[in-house]
């Protein structure tokens, strides 16, 4: 099978390349520069401008769309990449005589917060990031009459190569304090290991129904305190104490630090909600990596 992967140099993208090459597939990575990506071809394409996209999508059977930004200085940049970039890719695919199947890696942020969120529920994103990812989903629907597209919404993704979620947790464990923004009480999150996500995306590529949205996770609602304790167990430290930060304080601090920082208005808008979990989805996919297993592999490698 011939695959084109966008976002191939990112955290999820590099793992996806490994899964595809290990599976014996013919893989092309869409890039703006030409990095060293062993075992795959590269094709120039710029989602921000559309340059090179039509040539890059020629002759492929599947497109795995992973490109996107998770932190940006303004909502315009989120939209430019996550929504408009996806729209440009969709337009290039729709221009082909026989468009390939497209799997779009969206986010649970596009659905919005809550416990056991289901695919059929009305989306209610609370951040610029979530709204931009929902915009990318709309781009797929605009070409659904031409392009057989499938949307996958993962929650928090972790694993080897993660430079955002796990490093922050490790820092929290080492300080002994695990911040929780907003009102007191339990906080629930869905997670998925990057390798399980790759398998879910490939399952969607093979057997997902065109036009469908699929929520994927490791199948467990994790308490925030338990996540911190699991990281501590791998590091041989005491479980960190959950420290609640009032929402007003966090919002004020985020305005000072700005959108480009770890503590930014977008992240605070999401963190104020005590639950981000999804119900077991309709995709015929079974996660294999538990949180303790995934953390052990990622943090002791």
Predicted regions and their residues:
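Conserved Rossmann-fold NAD(P)-dependent oxidoreductase catalytic core, especially the SDR/UDP-sugar
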Residues: 87-128
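Active-site Tyr-X1-5-Lys
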Residues: 124-150
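N-terminal Rossmann NAD(P)H-binding glycine-rich loop of SDR-like oxidoreductase domains
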Residues: 3-23
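Mid/C-terminal beta-alpha module of Rossmann-like enzyme folds, strongest
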Residues: 203-262, 291-299
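Substrate-positioning beta->alpha
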Residues: 163-168, 182-205, 211-212
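A hydrophobic C-terminal alpha-helical subdomain
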Residues: 247-286
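Amphipathic terminal alpha-helices
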Residues: 277-301
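NAD(P)H-binding glycine-rich loop region in Rossmannoid oxidoreductase-like domains
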Residues: 44-87, 108-113
